[in-house]
């Protein structure tokens, strides 16, 4: 059974700005995530350390420094929460984007509970 992939509007905007080659890499990795779900591991997915969310992970399109932070919910969905290219700011990228992803995930879950 395939997993549903939801895309936060800010991530959707980011995707639109990618080159064709980058976009193809991201889509291929998203397709693998949809097919395999939480069992998809390295090199495509890695767990994020230092997050308040135990299930926060990063999608790692092969051969690139692009990263997409995402989390699974209890309804078999992965939500892409924050994205970017960490090549220009390798360590600070996570310091900036982990809190953004956490906040978006909590907001979406609160919204879905209503």
Each model region followed by its residue ranges:
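Basic, Lys/Arg-enriched alpha-helical interface segments
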Residues: 1-65, 74-78, 85-114
